[in-house]
Amino acid sequence: MKALKIHGAGHMTTEQVPVPEPGVGEVRVRMQYGGICGSDLHYFFEGRNGEFEVLEPFTPGHEMSGVVDLDPSGRLAAGTPVAIAPATYGTPEAGIEDRRHLWPGGTYFGSASTRPHTQGGMQEYRVVQDFMIRPLPEGLATDAAALAEPLAVALHALRMAGGVAGRTVLVTGCGPIGLCVAAACAAQGAARVDATDALEGPLDRARSVGAATTYRAGVDDVPATAYDTVFECSGAAPAVSQALRSVRRAGTVAQVGMLPDQPVGVNLAPFVSKEVTFTGCFRFDDEIDEAIELLAAHPEIARVITHVIPADRVQEAFDIARDSQQSGKVVVSLWLDS
């Protein structure tokens, strides 16, 4: 079978590897679609994602969907369309028993955080543990289902912020995660969703998924002390300062975008003087089930996907995904004609 392999910065190949055999408690999935995440971009273009360096060839991809190929238990028929929950969980820790995604020792598809690295899903077949399988509801196509994982990240952020129904919301940073956050807020009854970004392309896409008013960062004046909840999705220090400036007194800022693992210059004065609740948001726990339901109920969320590109043009796919002016979520189709 074919599999994409990242060897280091700028070096990715398509290789022939053996078709894996599922064991007890496992299912073999014919992978069909994989979304390109920011971590995939870091691994390919830089050879590392933060502190996690590519030290051996590994397959990227954790935003995955496909169809069941073989379930030895007989529970799932071949051809059943599914999305994949890409995490395994580590050892429970006191105080976070209800936050499995924070337990130490877990793994995540397509990650160099462990050695050996955890292989991802951008290959023709992938054996997964049966608890990772999420059958899709009727009418939800597997290409759109590649959004289940990033939408779950967005829904986890909404949960961490205490929900958005009836609230005014600002989203800073309209890359794929920011777009998923904006779409989720609109679908879940926010009174108003506004958005900021440094580029016009992402703002166009934000309006297409429910943003009412958009602001060019560094060009337009963004309202101050105006929003019940701000979701900071860029991971840029100036946007963190903007989020704290724009949130109302006693409001909530949810930090969704990953920040660099080093000191950054952020104006924290509003955090103190307005008694802002500032919460971090990391991956998700069980929100992927809600994400799948939301995708089925709100097909407009699939507008977050701007490109579907065959795996034989994967270099082009990664180049487009890196260009946030022209692309939202870029999805790779995995040799569907083979």
Q: Which residue ranges define each predicted feature?
A:
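C-terminal hydrophobic helical "lid"/dimerization subdomain
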Residues: 1, 285-338
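N-terminal glycine-rich cofactor-binding segment
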Residues: 5-21, 38-65, 83-88, 103-117
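Glycine-rich beta-strand-centered segment in the early N-terminal region that forms part
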Residues: 20-34, 48-96, 137-139
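Residue-level marker of beta-strand positions
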Residues: 63, 80-81, 102, 125, ...
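Mid-domain Rossmann-like dinucleotide-binding core that forms the NAD(H)/NADP(H) cofactor-binding site
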Residues: 79, 131, 137-219
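Glycine-rich cofactor phosphate-binding loops and adjacent beta1-alpha1 units
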Residues: 161-162, 203-277, 337
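Residues in the short beta-alpha loop(s) of Rossmann-like NAD(P)-binding domains
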Residues: 198-199, 259, 284
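Rossmann-fold dehydrogenase core element
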Residues: 252, 265-304
